């Protein structure tokens, strides 16, 4: 994708770096069009990837681990002490998941 600060006109300007936007921009560039992608969020992937579905599912996954530690492990004879949740670490891991996926899109 081209540098939007250039004074040369673009053939295609795509607004929004969600799943439709970045795919459209990639395809336009593959077809030889001078393409700009405008994304206000600062990272590609759209709402689902950055603040919606994926972060929510990452936190849900963490909560499932907590539930297993509290309930399912004992069924298998695994006894743990008091289980505690480090919310700050859960949020850090969630951010790492999102960052990994958004950085993967940027490599396209």
Question: For each predicted feature, which ranges?
Answer:
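Residue-level marker of alpha-helix boundaries and capping positions
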Residues: 15-16, 96
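Short glycine/serine/threonine-rich phosphate/pyrophosphate-binding segments
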Residues: 20-24
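Glycine-rich Rossmann-fold phosphate-binding loop(s) that bind the pyrophosphate
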Residues: 16-19, 42
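Glycine-rich flavin
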Residues: 2-4, 9, 27-33, 39-108
């Amino acid at each position: 994708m081209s540098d939007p600060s250039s004074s040369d006109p673009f053939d295609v300007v795509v607004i929004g770096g969600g799943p439709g936007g970045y795919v459209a921009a990639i395809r336009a560039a593959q077809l030889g069009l001078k393409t700009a992608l405008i994304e206000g969020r600062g990272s590609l992937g759209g709402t689902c990837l950055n603040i919606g579905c994926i972060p929510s599912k990452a936190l849900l996954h963490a909560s499932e681990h907590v539930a297993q530690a509290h309930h399912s492990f004992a069924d298998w004879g695994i006894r743990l002490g008091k289980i505690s949740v480090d919310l700050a670490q859960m949020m850090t891991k969630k951010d790492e998941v999102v960052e990994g996926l958004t950085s993967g899109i940027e490599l396209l």
